Every structure is written in structure tokens, then in C-alpha cells.
């Protein structure tokens, strides 16, 4: 019975979306800053489960840190347990940076059996980054040769695959000579070549190294991996490498990705899904391999990278450009929020603006910069991508629904983050909603609807309401509730936006989009009337289910408070088709909700009236007397229904309950006159029974007429104690109880 | 504007071109075409040998030329068209004459004021992209442009409605010698075996019909196009008892040009090149917006 009333009143308008708002600390990538934190950052939000997982990983790490020589896997259950823990956590969400030192250390030290070492290495999947120090210390293990050849090979393959995940590489570059010396091992040679290929910089190319490579080639014959390294050397120092190398080689290196690539992608995807806003994609290499499709129709959000074009125009220009490059901060290096703050004045935007969608740091930047070209680039890209990938407009796209869903989800999260809708998204919705089946990507589409920008755009009816209404009436109860929910969010976003504009208007900002206040009020009113209409029809179609009524009343909880909470000079009463089903509901939840709403309407209307009187000037917007009249009619009906048992006589609403006594007699209901008040109302009768049982435990006749006078007051207290807070505020505000004897009257708002 | 040098745009004629729409190019500059060619050729080489280092500027197997075509535009507001050509150098001899053109692509805008008026300076409006050659090259060149100028490409399909407009417009055009038949291809796709119906009309007959339909010369309305097509349909129905209106128009070919609904065009008359490109530019712009 406990309703959400308590938390309701003090809520600030702008906090509505805090679910998707950002926690700045979450952008730090950890690793180099605070490993502990980054571990937590990469956890999924379902905390309970993770708490235990976190614990088991910590236990496993401390076990592996202390493990003594030669524990047998078969005999030692602790080893088994911890090994499985590491494996399962690694595959599910990847390992935190600090795990690598411990696990690499144990795997390469040769303390444990090879099967254990192999399994450990195979599960070394990073959640974010791999600390360079852990790699360096494992190279030193490699040099003392404690581990077997197979483990060495596996380690090298791991290193090649994970190369881009290592946070720094300076020390690793310094180990170039060590790696080079491993070339002599015939088995390791191909992998070492690949690693060297990744590590080689111009200063590494030395005559003695070239000689060594040529010797190896003479010994082993033309090997593609040696050729690759030689060709790179030749590229750096053509004067030192004089031999001719075959121009076309299909593949230089065997696939050394090993068992990790798939795991990395899976972990990446999962971590991205679980975070409130997409995690930064720190690497360009690990884009999920999308299916083979036409080149221009891949749904891939580009990775941030700086536009390097125009770099080498000519020699002179080159210098200038290089100088400029030193000045600007390449977007690839942007990893933490503090970096963003330090370099915000010299940050260059990525060459493909779409990449900001998956780069929260850049979204912060977008948020605070006013540059038309940024939005135009996003607009074009997003508009094209949405149209091209739309699964119900483009044939043959239905097999890619999951990807499209993910994309829409990303767009929605970005909109939440920016607290602003994209116009390309709006256009997409207008274009495609008429063709939508209401099923495909349902929740994503309905969420995007919530971010349609507020403008005095007159076509919103034919573009949004008409197609939505068609689907609404022909779809399930659940769909109806989802539509109402997203229209409520839409209304709230509009109202919040209006509040923000009002606030900033003092700083001489005018409504963007050239919306006047009256245009804006009209647009909001149109939405509320639309919801009133579809709600009325839906209640009839579905036969007044409480579930549906809840969503409808939830919408009106926002509507009834627009004047006070959002400073919008507009109040619209619910239509009779919503009001009466709620008033006569069999469920106390709906009745209580209605009471609360009517109480807030009263508060808002009274405040408006007072404002009007105190200002003594003609306000641009005045609530029409129609609104006051409608409110009064509803209140009279409510008081008659809940208090004075006079609803059939007093209700003056044209579509109300006023009925002739003769007609009422025909219903053969005894004492019809009293059949509606807080005791007899079907939604309240359950409380009355319980109250009677407590007040007169011996009386089993259920004599409701006993509840009167002082007992009536007790009964009220009893109802309030049951959590009917809405009823309480309504009765206390709208019912004049000073002179109980003379018929209780409705508090009248009209002054 | 018909004073463009027909020689310089002649390369477009009598070839099949695949059509794409392109969103405005960001920070594209006509002053850097040679640099673009160099970067693009390195990019192509890099794409071909997956992930291996490539030096920028050296002689590579594929030569890239990026040039400006000021003749190919409608008004002064239009950007000059950009032509991208890929030629294969034969590996045996290094002589220039051995180069073989393998792919060309042309970005253009003919009377695209609708779009170009609206966009800020940093953007270059060349909404129509035509390609001839292997799609693998289109893919590489397209990706490079996407990456470098933050634009998006979409295949420009031509709807049956637009095809019928083309049929009517092109039928009415004057051509010196009317040798090519006007041909319309319809597809009945809902059958177990797809069925294509080809409907060829003598160009003079078609023109005579169109002349009776068109009220004001130089101006075409949707209604006139509908009447023209309906006449053709009823004529066909009289002979074969098939309602063509129930099928889908997939291809139109006339002496002026031929167009396929998948977004393929072939220009046949240089004097009407600008006109056809203008129509295609319009389609491309509506595709973007």
C-alpha cells in the first residue's frame, strides 16, 4: 500500500535523468592512476554478484602470490578453485591491471605444472590495460629460462596480441636487444619477428642486426617473418638494406591472435553494455569484426583519431604542420578527464565525428563547445547511418537487428548524457514511425521518442502522434503502458529544457529554435491533450485495468505540477474519461494517486491565482476560467464520492455521475445514497472492514454505519496510517471541516 | 549552362556508373588535390597489404590521380566536380604509357543550390558520387574519404516514381537521329520465378504520345507523367492483358540515358549530360536530407 508519495515533493526537475548522468570519476581509466578504482569501474552494476566475484578474485590473487613450488592440480583443491575463479572472471569481465603482475609471475616462474601455466596465460584477458611493469618482469623470467618452451611461445603470442593494451611501452622498447637475441631459437623465431616488427623504431635498425637477420635467412631460407622484419628495416634505412625483397607477400605473420581475441571482444562488449554510458574505446584495434557487408553499410561507430590529412603538402608546409601538430593534442591520447581539462584549449576533434558517441570524454567537450560544424558532421553521419541501417525500412537488414538495437541504445545514452535530442534522430523517427511495426527495437525506439526536441513544429501531430496512435490502439496493454511511459519522459524532458532556458534567459539567451513561449505552451498542451485522448480510449478498450491507470495517472502527476515545478503557465485537467475511471476505481492505489494529483492541481491553481492578483498587471498567460471550472467540478464530484455521499446529487460535470433518484431506485441497491464515501467506496471498503475488526473485535455483523462522529476521525487516522498519503493531503486541503455539522463543503479555489 | 567543353566530360559517356549520395565533405580543399592523391595511394597500398607499414609518396602499383573538373557543374554556386582515377602500373615496364585505368570516381554537384546554400564554409557540397570499376576500389576510396572528410556514402537507389519521370522527360528530348528504342523493364518479383517484362517502344511513337500529353513545353507535372505512363500501360494491356501498373518499373533506357533502380546510370548524349546530372543531384540531395 505504501506509495511513492514521500519522495515526490522535493524532487528537483533536473534530477530526473540521473540514472544516465555521468560520474566524472568513471572516466578515469585506472591502471596508471588508481588501479583499485579502475577495477571497480569495470564492474557491472549488479553489485551483489560482483561483490562475491571481486572477493574470489582477490583471494585467488593472494593465493597465487604466495603459492609454493609444485602444487599438484589434481590433489590440491585450493589451486583448482582459484584457477577456475581466475578463468571465469577473466572471460566474463576481464582482469584488472594489478592482476597481471601476479599471474604472469606465477605462470612464467615455472613453479606450477605446465597445464596450470597454460591455463593461466590463456585467461590473461585485460578489462582495461596491462601495466608495462608486469610485462617487463615477465620478460626477465623468460631470460632465466625457468619455464618450458611451450609456455614461452604462448607468452610471446599473448604479448603480440595484447601489445596495444600495454599502458606504456618505453621500457619495453628498451628491451629490444633482449627480444632480438631470442631470434636464434628456431621455434620462437616467427613470433619474435612479429614482436620486433611491432617494436622496431628507426633507431633500432643497426648494421649488426641486419647482418644477423641476413645470416638467419641464409640458414633458414626465405622465411616470410624474416622478410617482414627486413622490409621494415629497409623502409626505415633503405641505405643499409640493399637486398631486394619480393614486393608482394600475402601474409607475413601467421595468425598469432591465439585464444584471446574473441575473449577480448566479448569482455569489451559486456563491459560496455553494463556501464551507464559507453566506456571509452581506448584502442582502434579491437573493433568488433563486423560481418561482411557492403563497404559503406557497416554499422561501425568510428574510433576517434586525429585528422592527419594535409600533413605532407610539401616540404616547407610540412614544417609548419609538424609545428602545429606539436601544439594540438591528439585525440588518441586523451584518456582521462584531467587530461581533457589540461588540454581542452588545444584538443583537436577526431576526423570522424561519429566517434564521440563512444568516447565519453569527448562528449564532455562537445557539451561545452558551441561549434556548428560539430553538430552538422554528427547530424549527417547519424542521419545516414540510421536510415541505412534501419531494420524495418531497408530490406535484408532484419538479420542485423541486434546491432541496430545496440546502435540506437548508444544514441539514446548519448542523448541522455548531453540532455539533448539529436535532430537527425528526430527526423529519422518522423520518417520511419509510419512504417514501424511497433515490435522491432521497441524499447529503443520508444526511448528515442523521449528525446524529440521541443519546438513549435506544427507537424508533430502527423509525424509522431498519428502513427503512434495507430500502433497504440492496436497493440497490447504492455505496449500501451510503454508508450505512456515514454510520452511522460518526453513531457519531462521538454519541461526540463524549458526550465533550463528560463534560467539561462537572464543571461540574455533567447529561446533557441525561435520558439516563443506561446508556441512552446501550445506544443506542450498538444502533447497533453493527445495523451488524454489516447488514455480515454485505452481505458475503454482495455476495460480500466489498474496497471494502465497507474501509467496514465503517473503522466498526470507531472502535468498537475507544471506551473509550480517547471514554471510553465499551463495546467490541463485530465479528461473525464480518465478522471471518472480513476475515481471509481476498485483499487485504492489509483484512488490515492488521483487524490494526490487533485491536491497538486489545487496547489498550482491557488498559486497561479495569487500570482495573478498580486502582480496587478495583465499577465501574458492566464489560466482560463474553464480550467478552474473543470477543477471545481471534479472536486465536487470527489468530495461527494469520498465524503458527503452526495455524488449522485451534486456532481455537475456534464459527463459526471449525477443521477435521478428514480433511476437510482431502479438499480435496487439499498441505501444508494450512502454507497459512495470513504467507508463505502469499493476501493476503501477493505479498509473499513479491517478497521471494524480492530475497533469492535466482537462484532461480526460489519455494521459500517458505526463509523461516524469520533469514529469517523479515527477511521481517517487509520487510513492515513495505512499509507494513503494522497488521500490525506486531499482531504486536509480540499475539505472544510471547521463546522462538521453544516454540510462539509468543497474548498473552492475560485477566490 | 551548356558552354562546358564536351571533350572534358566525354569520359562519362557510354559507361555504366554506380550512383551514391555523399554528405558534405568536411575541410576538403581544392588546393590539396595532389596531396590527397598521394595519401590515397598510400592508403590503397596499405589496405592491400593489411597492417604492414607503407611509405607515403613512393611509387606504388596503383597510381592515383585526383583532379578538378570545373566544366562539370551547373552554376557558379556549384563546387567544381572532383575526379578520382586509379590506374594500374604494369610491373614489368615502368613506362608511363603502360598505365591502365582501372577505376574512376566522380564527385559532382549540378545545380545543388538547395544544399550548398545551407551549409557553412568548412563543408564542400558534392552530393553525387559516380563510380565505374571494381567495387573493391570503390570501397577503399570511399572509406578513405569517409575517414578523411567525415562524410558518409549511401547507394542511391532510384524509385519507380523517379524512373517514370526519367522515362517521360527523356522521351520528350530532341535527339538528332532517333535510333535507340525507348525501353522500359518491369519486374514481377512476387512470383516463384522472378519475371522481367521488357517493353520497347519506337522513340518517335513515344515522343508523339508525350507531345500529346505535355501541356506547356519545358514544364512537366506529376499528372502528365502519370497520364503518359497510364497510356503506355493501357496500350500494353490491350495487347497482352497484363497490368503493368501492378509490377515494378526497374529500368528505363532511352537515347538520352539509361537508368536502373539499383542506382546505375549510363549517359548517352553529351548535350543532355548536365540535365541528367542535375536530376541525379536533386535525388542525391533529397537522399541526404
Task: Place the predicted regions along the sequence by residue.
Chain B
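Terminal interaction module
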Residues: 150-251
